[in-house]
Amino acid sequence: PGGRPALLWNVKIAADPQRSADEYRLTLGLLLRDGGYSPADVDAVALGSVVPALTHTLREALGRLCRGSDGTPVPLRTVSAGTRTGLVLQVDDPAQLSADIVTGAAAAVWLYGTPVAVLDFGTPTVLSCVDANRTLLGVSIAPGMQTSLDGLRGAAALIPHVELRAPESVLG
């Protein structure tokens, strides 16, 4: 809306430190093609890894997958709390911010402008808020939906197995 860029495509895959760079390269290539893109369409990569053991493997996979017309790897930047995003990090310890929180906030500002709130329903549920001055005001982290459901099942054995999907009715 209003001339702002649109999110073209979004996909998530499970993080598995046992997978090789070749496995990630093939998986990412297939996912790109499934989304209607080619690795040749990629002109730069921002990697926001929250699994340090995977960062090198993913850099290797992406470096071999995403290459320019001359065959050289496209620019690849690993994002962290110290990466310049145009955001002011007004949190107690900016070094503790994970890459997914920083990239999510920066992407939300890029897509929707400010002020903006970001709610990420991943392994943890993360709420981040950016004000009109591009200041990341803070982050709230809680157990994710699957994590909470697994904990509930473990603590209350009589609760039946339910899938995480939209219910037909809010109560029932």
Where are these regions (language model features)?
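Short glycine-rich, Thr/Ser-proximal phosphate-binding strand/loop in the N-terminal lobe
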Residues: P1-R33, T135-L158
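Gly/Thr-rich phosphate-binding beta-strand-loop-beta motif of the actin/hexokinase/Hsp70
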Residues: P1-W9, A108, T114-L136, L152
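Conserved active-site and cofactor/substrate-binding residues in soluble primary-metabolism enzymes
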Residues: R19, E23-L26, S49, A53, ...
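Short, well-ordered alpha-helices that flank and scaffold nucleotide-derived cofactor binding pockets
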Residues: L30, E60, R64, W110, ...
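Short beta-strand-loop/turn "lid" adjacent to the catalytic site in phosphate-handling enzymes
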Residues: G35-Q96, D131-G138, M145, G172
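Extended, hydrophobic alpha-helical segments
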Residues: A53-T55, A108, R165-V170
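Conserved phosphate-binding catalytic cores of ATP/NTP-utilizing and phosphoryl-transfer enzymes
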Residues: T83-V116
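A mobile "lid/hinge" subdomain adjacent to the ATP/sugar-phosphate binding pocket shared
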Residues: A155-G172
